[in-house]
Structures are given as C-alpha cells and as structure tokens.
Regions:
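Autoinhibitory propeptides
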Residues: 1-13, 25-28, 35-104, 388
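Solvent-exposed loop/turn segments at secondary-structure junctions
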Residues: 85-87, 121-123, 189-191, 224-227, ...
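Subtilisin-like serine protease catalytic core
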Residues: 105-117, 121-136, 146-196, 213-216, ...
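Extracellular S/T/G-rich loop segment that most often corresponds to the catalytic His/Ser-adjacent loop
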Residues: 119, 267-355
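Gly/Ser-rich catalytic serine loop of serine hydrolases
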Residues: 143-156, 338-348
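Short glycine/serine- and small hydrophobic-enriched flexible loop segments
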Residues: 163-164, 204-205, 351-359
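Substrate-binding/access-modulating region of protease and related hydrolase catalytic domains
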Residues: 188-271, 339-341, 345-347, 385-386
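C-terminal subdomain of the subtilisin-like protease fold in secreted/lumenal serine endopeptidases
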Residues: 215-219, 359-400
Length: 400
C-alpha cells in the first residue's frame, strides 16, 4: 500500500490522511485502459465528471475510500487535486479608451480562419452577430446551456478584440480580425474561475474539432499559479498536439508584478506564444501587473502588446440565454463598449494578428508564426525580460 500511495499527489495525500473533506475533485492520469477506469468510476456512487482523451485523464469527485481503492489499479499512474485557473483582466473606469483596431486600408481581416477561445462565454453582442456571424460555435462546460451568454464579461471583451466588427462605433472599436470566426467555450464561471480539468477538456475539444471549423489559433486568456509537474506536462502535451494539428496557442504572461522571473504556470512553456502587457498611455512602459521572465534559458514573454484601458465589447452579465430549453433574447445594451486592463487583452490582440497571418498563408507552422512575430518586433527602452522581443510592428509584419 505504501508504494501505491506514491501515486497520490502530496497535497491530496495529506488531505486524505487528515480526513479533511467528504469528497475530492481529482484528476486521474492513466497509463492505459482509460475507458476501463471510467467504467469503474461510473459503476460506483461517485461522480464521474469528464474524460480528456488526448491527455489520458479522467476528472471525478471521489471519496477518500474510492481514491485509495482505485489507485491500486496498475493502469493508474497519478491522482492529483483538480486545481483552478483564473482570468487575466479586470474592468476599469477610464476616460482614456485605447482602440486596438488596425488601419482602414489593411488588406487582411481573418476571413476563413477560426479562433478557439476558452473563457467565460460570449454575449451575443451586435458587433459579433450582425453582418457576419462571429460566434461559429458555443459550448458551455459550466452549466450546459446551448446558446451564447457571458455572466462574467471577459469572454465577450476578448472576442471583441479578436473579431468585433465595430458596427456600433462606426468602426472605432473594431477588432483585429473582424472577418474571423470565434469558437467560444465557456469554462470559467461568473467569478472568472475555472477548474483546470474543464480547461483541459475545452482545449482537447478545440483540437479535435479544428479541421471542421478551421481553428488555427487557440486563445487562452487566463493563468494558473500552480507549478505542479503533472498539470504543466498535461498542458504541454495538449499544446504539442495543437502544434501538430497546425494550431498556434496564445497565452498572456499573467498578472504577477513585472519583477524578474515572476511568470508562472503554462505561460513559461515553449509550446505556446506568451504575450506580455504594455502601458501605452504616454511613454510606453511595461504594465505593472504583467508577469515577467526569464524562465530558465527560455525568453518569456515572447513579445508584448498594449493591455491598459483597452476598449472592447460590453456585455449584459445578468442575461441567461435559455430557460427550460427555450432560447431567450437579450435586452438592448445601454453601453455597447467598456474598458478593461490586463494581459489577456494583449493575448487577444496577438491572437487576432495570428488569424490574419493564417489568412495570408494557411500552411504556416507554430515556428513560422513565432519567427514572423519576433522578427517584426521593436525592443523598447526597458529590460528584455519584461517585454520579450518587444512591441509588434504590424506594418513591418505584413510588408512582405
């Protein structure tokens, strides 16, 4: 039994030893026979939640007794707590509103390219639903509703940066790739918090459906604080699968202070593009709460983009899209736009830029995209570990 208990994460083992909870939401990693483990859990009184096929993982709510019983199975390699992820932006009241739109004569618009997004959902904002349908698919992992909604607001805001058409601002607050599509997965609740297992499931779903919707970019506008090796290796495995499927994953550097080596979680992986935040009000400087590198020998963030007082789409966070299976329609918004600050804004901007690059050349790889972005950046007058290769020059990027 002692050797078997080594399969338990140390925090989970301690909680079980001290009888802290009646049940434990856990992630179970299997070496093989995932379906057999799923069947075993469903046979009992415990609560099976989901299976993440690409990562050979199962999420479930189990009693301590069930955990100690199931861990004896040789096909199980590890059981750990299901941790949390957190969104990387906050609403701000500001008279200064920064638009991230590109020039009126810009050649590309993201046409034919879909951006997968894991966030708090997407409100059916007119800037996303008129002219062309911006939300190509909506999936609600939190509550299982069929129709788009957003009870936090971040997902709608990020969607607007990527592909809002600016129809209610005469184009002033148009997104970067207004002809692209959004596959929106709601994994975050109204407080901006998500179980990591739900995030894994969302990423796995986007990869599996990427061919059907031509998903070329996955935007993950959130962070995790854990350095748990299993969780990070699972993110890395999913990111590698995305790369092999022709998809680029874009993430924010995070919300820690911009002190040396403050980046945490998957933002430090070399299988994603990590975007730091800039304060562009007055002299451009690193945003105070933009997590910084370096990460060992790896340069992170990869590049930086504006993230302070960004203006994008507002949402009615009280709107619920259905009742008893029937679709409900939202009331007209009093204000179509709002301002937010945070590195998720910077990640959304770069996600939109990646959509434009894929419209230009759909065969580009992860390494191609990263090289093109880095070669088109300009270093700013502060430490490289805060900015990566610097601020992106979009004119230079698309000049060739």
């Amino acid at each position: 039994m002692f050797s078997v208990r080594k399969k338990l994460d140390s925090s989970l083992k301690s909680a079980i030893d001290n009888d802290r909870f009646k049940s434990y939401r856990v992630i179970i990693h299997c070496n093989a026979l995932v379906d057999a483990v799923e069947h075993k859990i469903k046979q009992g009184k415990d609560n099976f939640i989901c299976k993440i096929e690409e990562a050979n993982c199962i999420c479930a709510n189990l009693s301590a007794q069930s955990i100690l019983k199931i861990i004896e199975k040789p096909e199980i390699s590890l059981i750990t707590f299901d941790d949390f992820a957190y969104l990387c932006s906050s609403n701000v009241v500001s008279k200064n509103k920064v638009s991230l739109k590109l020039g009126e004569s810009f050649k590309y618009s993201g046409k034919g390219v879909c951006v997968g997004m894991v966030d708090s959902g997407t409100f059916p904002h007119p800037d996303l639903m008129t002219r062309t349908k911006g939300i190509v698919k909506f999936l609600d992992i939190v509550s299982g509703l069929k129709y788009p909604y957003d009870d936090n607001g971040d997902g709608t805001f990020v969607s607007g940066i990527i592909r809002g058409n600016g129809s209610n601002s005469k184009g002033m607050y148009r997104g970067v790739a207004p002809s692209s599509g959004i596959y929106s997965i709601k994994a975050f609740n109204s407080l901006g918090k998500a179980y990591i297992s739900n995030v894994f499931l969302a990423i796995d779903t986007l990869i599996n459906e990427s061919k059907e919707f031509n998903i070329k970019v996955i935007c993950l506008p959130f962070e995790i604080s854990t350095e748990d090796n299993f969780i990070l290796s699972t993110f890395n495995k999913l990111f590698e699968k995305a790369i092999s499927s022709g998809i680029v994953v874009v993430v924010p550097s995070g919300t820690n202070e911009n002190t040396r080596s403050s980046i945490r979680g998957f933002a430090a992986l070399d299988t994603c593009i990590t975007v730091g935040g800039l304060n562009t009000e007055g002299k451009i400087k690193s945003y105070t709460y933009s997590s910084s590198g370096p990460c060992g020998k790896l340069t992170k963030p990869d590049l930086s983009a504006p993230c302070v007082n960004i203006c994008s789409l507002n949402s009615d966070t009280n709107y619920i899209s259905e009742r008893n299976g029937s679709k409900l329609y939202p009331n007209k918004l009093n204000n179509y736009y709002t301002t937010c600050t945070g590195t998720s804004c910077a990640a959304a901007y770069v996600s939109g830029i990646c959509a434009l690059l894929f419209e230009k050349d759909n065969s580009l790889t992860f390494k191609d995209i990263l090289s093109l972005l880095n070669a088109s950046c300009t270093l700013l007058n502060f430490p490289k570990w805060q900015q990566g290769e610097g601020i992106l020059d979009v004119t230079k990027l698309f000049s060739s």
